[in-house]
Amino acid sequence: MNASGNAGATADDHRPTLEDARAALSRHFGYEEFRPGQEAIIQAALMGCDSFAVMPTGSGKSVCYQLPAALFGGLTIVVSPLISLMADQVRALKEAGIRGSFYNSTLKPRVRPEVLRRALAGWYDIMYVAPERLTDPSFQEFAAQANISLVAVDEAHCVSQWGQDFRPAYRAIAGFVNLLPVRPPVMALTATATARVRTDISQLLELRSPVMQVTGFDRPNLRFVVLELRPKERERWLTGYLRTHPGDAGIVYAPTRKKVEQIAASLCEQGVLARAYHAGMSDAARDEAQRAFANDDALVLVATTAFGMGIDKSNVRFVVNCGLPLSIEEYYQEAGRAGRDGEPADCYLLWSRGDIRTCHFFIDNIEAEGLSGEERQRVIEGKERLLGEMIGYAMSSSCLRRRILRYFGQDVTMLSDGCGNCSVCDGETPQRYLSDEGISSRRSADTRAKSDPAAARVRSLREEDDFPPHDDDEEVFERLRTLRKELADQQGVPPYIVFSDATLRGMVRRRPRTAEELSAVSGVGKVKLERYGQAFLEALK
């Protein structure tokens, strides 16, 4: 630790600078500029200050702590509830040239001491930690000896009982930080938090004058559709939708384990590469399902809402909720799994009035471990209010995007005439989709990008370079996807970790012929250029 008491740097004249961070951004991730909000949060970490980032899913929150971790000499602790994702996150770090590890209940007891020993020896830049581990005496003993340069709290809304994913174990974070010999800067990150939840997070994490960045909640590449359909009609609709979207990866959410199994089995019978995912499955079965989906061996994952945050696959093209979520936060988290690569994606809510009874049942039987009876009642009342907002969204006759953004407190004056990219604004109805075959032919993403104002904005933002389209663009894109899958299987990583769909699209548009030209494609960093560059250049010939 340094004499200044800030674990994030050794001394003022040796602090990593923002220019160092920009160079690391290009080297590790292949991006030349920070995304909105990233610069201020990274600067705060480099200066040893606390920070709080509220940024949309897919906007690069993880880079906010990954870059400082790559520059600091110590260890960055990332507290995360996403145990099922940690192994993939560590693999992604390795692909980017950053040393990572994780510490959670999936590690065998005999392995845990070795992981901590290596961390003390300086083997890692980042360690992902489940919140439950923070109260483990052996981990606390390790932390007291470690050179911890930053504590990042991912999915920070989990600390608030007013948030949609309250996790009592998150309440231990502030105490853990206070036990450290020297307090490092603390960084809180979330994609969905109302003003009330943000205040709660700051207080419960005991953030000290944090640098705050709320970049907005809008995801202009996502198209929102609400269809009021009875349960039996939903499966018929889903079958038709998948028939018109062959090759697209997507997530289907269902409210119960039984319904998950039923939908997954039905899809498999129809030849769809689908997997079920829910808490009633064994750890091995869940891991297999998640791995198959991440590796593109399964195109559709049918899951209970417990899976809501547990996927980091960037090229999910659709999310379908077969039932009413308990809150707008929960719905936006789940819908936000779609289109993380910035490409157009669809978010469907299929619901009926009967879903409201199911939601009330879930709320009345909520688990509230560690809470008193009075606290539990407050949680239930809060959940009822959140459900009321969700019902209002489902029944809305005004712009769906505007309703979501207003709920999170964002200025919506720019949407006074509607977004042009939701079922209310573009006049979509169930009848337009349902037909004798189950669904009518829907516009393609490319067609929609040309005709819908919101999708057109996405396209204009994405295509900062002016490269004319080629007749064989889709053929070349599929060739690159096939190569990516082969390389990913060889490396034992999910395909999206090699390159995202957006990066492959950039290659297709630019048609680079040299390593230098390939490095100009957004998402191609030095590490990946050296590892995969030649193979992709050959495929582009």
Where are the predicted features?
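Helicase motor core with emphasis on the C-terminal RecA-like subdomain
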Residues: 10-15, 19-28, 32-36, 40-62, ...
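Short alpha-helical segment immediately N-terminal to, or the first helix within
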Residues: 44, 321, 393, 506-507
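Short alpha-helical "packing" element that flanks the helix-turn-helix/winged-helix DNA-binding module
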Residues: 38-41, 390, 504
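Accessory DNA-binding and partner-docking regions appended to nucleic-acid-acting proteins
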Residues: 1-21, 357-358, 363, 367-376, ...
